[in-house]
């Protein structure tokens, strides 16, 4: 007995899926990261950079504040150094003294310009006092603009020159003052301060004031070097 079977024909296509005539193929969508998970690293990065930026800004503000304080101290020291320099120049220039012996026709006179060291001392202190007055506007600019490193460097160089000038003048005058007070027996130089008290007092005070100005200039140089190093 024969039976008839129905054959099932399965069509086979040679075309790739997705082309025209090919059966549609369902594809699963690609997995995507959740919005919350994607936004979490960005938020964390923003939180981590915000304190850094705030700390950096605070550091620069503190640095400018410290530089401004140093510049203001520099301004005050220049005013303080002006007094001793001017006093030394005036004391030396007005140290002349006349000593009368027996009559007015026999007089001994001590003048500062008879000693080159005292003349040098007066000129050096006058130059230093004038320089300090001229440097005050530049120092004020540095107070208002702490980042002006060029002005600090210029003042540092000029202050160093003033230190050398005043030190040389004060040292030379100190040697003459010591000789005027004590004399020199080997050279047969007699001490004159026993007779010319006013002359010796004024010149001695001028020497002390000059060394005080040198000390204040040294402080100015140290402050300027420290401020430039911070920059």
UniProtKB/Swiss-Prot annotation:
Cytoplasmic-facing ranges: 1-69, 139-152, 229-231
Transmembrane segments: 70-90, 118-138, 153-173, 208-228
InterPro entries: CASP/CASPL (IPR006459), CASP_dom (IPR006702), CASPL (IPR044173)
Extracellular topology ranges: 91-117, 174-207
Localization per Swiss-Prot or TrEMBL: Cell membrane
Entry's Gene Ontology BP terms: cell wall modification; cell-cell junction assembly
Keyword terms of this UniProt record: Cell membrane, Cell wall biogenesis/degradation, Membrane, Transmembrane, Transmembrane helix
Membrane topology: Multi-pass membrane protein
Pfam family, one: CASP_dom
Gene Ontology CC, one term: Casparian strip
Main function: Regulates membrane-cell wall junctions and localized cell wall deposition. Required for establishment of the Casparian strip membrane domain (CSD) and the subsequent formation of Casparian strips, a cell wall modification of the root endodermis that determines an apoplastic barrier between the intraorganismal apoplasm and the extraorganismal apoplasm and prevents lateral diffusion.
Similarity comment text for this entry: Belongs to the Casparian strip membrane proteins (CASP) family.
Description of how the protein assembles with itself and partners: Homodimer and heterodimers.
Name listed for the protein in its UniProt record: Casparian strip membrane protein 1
């Amino acid at each position: 007995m024969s039976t008839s079977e129905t054959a099932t024909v399965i069509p086979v296509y040679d075309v790739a899926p997705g082309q025209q005539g090919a059966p549609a193929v369902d594809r699963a969508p690609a997995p995507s990261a959740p919005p919350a998970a994607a936004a979490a690293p960005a938020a964390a990065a923003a939180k981590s950079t915000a304190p850094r930026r705030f700390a950096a800004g605070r550091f620069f503000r503190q640095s400018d504040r410290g530089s401004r304080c140093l510049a203001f101290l520099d301004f005050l020291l220049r005013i303080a150094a002006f007094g001793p320099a001017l006093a030394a120049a005036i004391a030396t220039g007005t140290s002349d003294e006349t000593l009368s012996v027996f009559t007015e026709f026999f007089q001994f006179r001590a003048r500062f310009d008879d000693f080159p060291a005292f003349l040098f001392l007066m000129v050096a202190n006058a130059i230093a006092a004038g320089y300090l007055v001229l440097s005050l506007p530049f120092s004020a600019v540095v107070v208002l603009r702490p980042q002006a490193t060029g002005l600090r460097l210029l003042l540092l160089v000029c202050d160093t020159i003033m230190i050398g000038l005043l030190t040389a003048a004060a040292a030379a005058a100190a040697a003459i003052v010591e000789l005027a007070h004590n004399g020199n027996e080997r050279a047969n130089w007699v001490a004159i301060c026993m007779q010319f008290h006013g002359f010796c007092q004024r010149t001695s005070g001028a020497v002390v004031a000059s060394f005080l100005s040198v000390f204040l200039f040294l402080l100015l140089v140290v402050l300027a070097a420290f401020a430039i190093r911070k920059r």
